[in-house]
């Protein structure tokens, strides 16, 4: 190769001293032919040298780390992104010895991308021409980024302990929950901006970064599912038995609810750590003040009693406030109410009267309400992103978007949820059991949609399950329900998943059962199931004929959507003290 370079150097020097036009015609042809031949030879030598160089450096497709990386990425939805992102890491060959290593590297790369997005949003906030809603939406993005970073860090910690600290099934469910929530956060950020020209420029500035992180999270989720599914299959085979949960029920409660929390949820006499009373007879006059004063990062249950009264405020239980419990004096006596809404400049995310993010949150005997009304469009009464959270004897009252089951694992029992359009929506793994779900009278020309589930990826362990509940109309809608068609749900996102089972459905529900979101969007990729429902609106003969809709006839398939299976209820629900059923 050195000789070739020397030749071209001399050739260049020669040509610079002699004009090619002065060379005789035959010699000129010979010269050009020789020159072209040498170029080809040089190119071939260069390619061979490059290949040999890569072989010598160990960056070889036959190397073990390359095979592990390629195999791991092949299970993802975006394999090229998966491979290129990790292959670009310096000395990746020394770090990859297993699929677990690939996943951990992917999570660390994703964390860096999330941090990059954070600084991009901070830069956007310095713009002077932002609207009120754009500012609110950008702050929503900062909040969801903060949550995403926590989820990625927790996933790395869980992965480092895999598969020893917990059962395989617990590891699998926890990891899939964390990555599903991290993915959901990226869409939540973008959902805060409308698609119209008024604030499209801000959304466009964010979109590439958010979508990139969402794809990276999707890849990590797919690899986690592939790894844990494989390991559990090996365990089943080696043990020659079906892998089961360590504890399926504790007196009918999911096991993640400790005996102490079960008592708290059902006991009529509980000693609180703080008391809220609007008349000044407690420690605090507002719920928000009591939450702010609660210990952060607590591992013990911290109980806030909210005395009877109407509390006109917006309450946030942040991620730092863990294991908080609200106890009211009765669902008709303790009411937390607000009226934030999208029409007046809020985002859907920030419109919530009460927003709960802190892990292990419990509430009982309270009403969460948004009084904005149907003309104000999205106006959330309760938003929940708290993992392992549960609500008992609570009312959620609003119109459009009443209950926002945003992310993570959630359980609602003996609750009333009332609204109009998409009034139970989000991308949590949420089970509503023994609840009353009532459609209200909407604005003229509107249709009622009970659910709008937001699953964006086929590997997310999310969905809305309504079990052993009652679906009907409120007293204001019932006399005129024929004028307002009501459906069980519509697909908000591409892989929307909702199951209604063992519930009573009145004639309020349209015979088709389900409604489109926008034309054919998601009709082939959604999962809508019905199992053993009763009532005048439960007949399935007139239901939609979409590829994604099914009548579930197998008890085994239905069992997958019970609290014990769908939200890993056997590991945590028992601690709440709320009454529940884990199975069918």
Swiss-Prot record:
Tissues in which the protein is found: Expressed at high levels in flower buds, shoots and young leaves, and at lower levels in young fruit, young bark and juice vesicles. Not expressed at significant levels in leaf abscission zones following ethylene treatment or in mature leaves. In fruit abscission zones, expression was initially undetectable but increased markedly following ethylene treatment.
Top EC group: hydrolase
Active site (UniProt): 401 (proton donor), 422 (nucleophile)
S-S pairs: 415-435
Glycoprotein keyword on record: yes
EC number: 3.1.1.11
Coiled coil: none
Annotated glycosylation sites: 108, 129, 226
Catalytic activity: [(1->4)-alpha-D-galacturonosyl methyl ester](n) + n H2O = [(1->4)-alpha-D-galacturonosyl](n) + n methanol + n H(+)
Keyword annotations of the record: Aspartyl esterase, Cell wall, Cell wall biogenesis/degradation, Disulfide bond, Glycoprotein, Hydrolase, Secreted, Signal
Residue(s) at site: Transition state stabilizer: 400
Induction notes from the record: By ethylene.
NCBIfam families: PME_inhib
Miscellaneous comment text of the record: The PMEI region may act as an autoinhibitory domain and prevent untimely PME activity during transport.
UniProt similarity note: In the N-terminal section; belongs to the PMEI family. In the C-terminal section; belongs to the pectinesterase family.
Function, in words: Acts in the modification of cell walls via demethylesterification of cell wall pectin.
Name of the protein: Pectinesterase 1
UniProt organism field: Citrus sinensis (Sweet orange)
Annotated gene: PECS-1.1
């Amino acid at each position: 190769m050195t000789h070739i370079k020397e030749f071209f150097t001399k050739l260049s020097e020669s040509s610079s001293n002699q004009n090619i036009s002065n060379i005789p015609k035959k010699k000129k042809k010979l010269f050009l032919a020789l020159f072209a031949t040498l170029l080809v030879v040089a190119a071939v030598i260069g390619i061979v040298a490059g290949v040999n160089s890569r072989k010598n450096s160990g960056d070889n497709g036959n190397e073990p780390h390359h095979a592990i990386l390629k195999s791991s990425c092949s299970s993802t939805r975006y394999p090229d992104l998966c491979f290129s992102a990790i292959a670009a890491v310096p000395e990746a060959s020394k770090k990859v010895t297993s699929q677990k290593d690939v996943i951990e590297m992917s999570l660390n790369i994703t964390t860096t991308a999330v941090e990059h997005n954070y600084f991009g949003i901070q830069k956007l906030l310095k713009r002077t021409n932002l609207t009120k809603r754009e500012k609110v939406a950008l702050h929503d993005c900062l909040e969801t980024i903060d949550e995403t970073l926590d989820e990625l860090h927790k996933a790395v910690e869980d992965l480092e302990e895999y598969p020893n600290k917990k059962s395989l099934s617990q590891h699998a469910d926890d990891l899939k929950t964390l990555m599903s929530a991290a993915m959901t956060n990226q869409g939540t950020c973008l959902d805060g901006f409308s698609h119209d020209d008024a604030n499209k420029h801000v959304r466009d500035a964010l979109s590439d970064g958010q979508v990139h992180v969402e794809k990276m999270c999707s890849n990590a989720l797919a690899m986690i599912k592939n790894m844990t599914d494989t390991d559990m299959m090996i365990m089943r085979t080696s043990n020659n038995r079906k892998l089961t949960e360590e504890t399926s029920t504790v007196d009918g409660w999911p096991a993640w609810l400790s005996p102490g929390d079960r008592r708290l949820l059902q006991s009529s006499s509980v000693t609180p750590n703080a008391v809220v009373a609007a008349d000044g007879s407690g420690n605090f006059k507002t719920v928000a003040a009591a939450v702010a004063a609660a210990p952060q990062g607590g591992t013990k249950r911290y109980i806030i009693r909210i005395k009877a009264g109407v509390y006109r405020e917006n309450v946030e239980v942040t991620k730092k406030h863990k294991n908080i419990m609200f106890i009211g004096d009765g669902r008709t006596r303790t009411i937390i109410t607000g009226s934030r809404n999208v029409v007046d400049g809020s985002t859907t995310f920030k419109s919530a009267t009460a927003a709960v993010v802190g892990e292990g949150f419990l509430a009982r005997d309270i009403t969460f309400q948004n009084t904005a009304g149907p003309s104000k469009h999205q106006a959330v009464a309760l938003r929940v992103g708290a993992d392992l959270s549960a609500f008992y004897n609570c009312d959620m009252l609003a119109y459009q978007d009443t209950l926002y089951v945003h992310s993570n694992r959630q359980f609602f029992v003996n609750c009333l949820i009332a609204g109009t359009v998409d009034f139970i929506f989000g991308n949590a793994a949420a089970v509503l059991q023994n609840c009353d779900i009532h459609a209200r009278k909407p604005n003229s020309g509107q249709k009622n949609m009970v659910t709008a589930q937001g699953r964006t990826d086929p590997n997310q362990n999310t969905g809305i399950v309504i079990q052993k509940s009652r679906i009907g109309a409120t007293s204001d809608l019932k006399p005129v329900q024929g004028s307002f068609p009501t459906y069980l749900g519509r697909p908000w996102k591409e892989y929307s998943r909702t199951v209604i089972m063992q519930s009573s459905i009145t004639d309020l529900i349209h015979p088709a059962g389900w409604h489109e979101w926008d034309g054919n969007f998601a009709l082939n990729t959604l999962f809508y199931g019905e199992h053993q429902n009763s009532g005048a609106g439960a007949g399935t003969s007139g239901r939609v004929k979409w590829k994604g809709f099914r009548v579930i006839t197998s008890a085994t398939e239905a069992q997958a959507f019970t609290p014990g299976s769908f939200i890993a209820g056997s590991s945590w629900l028992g601690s709440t003290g709320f009454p529940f059923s884990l199975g069918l």
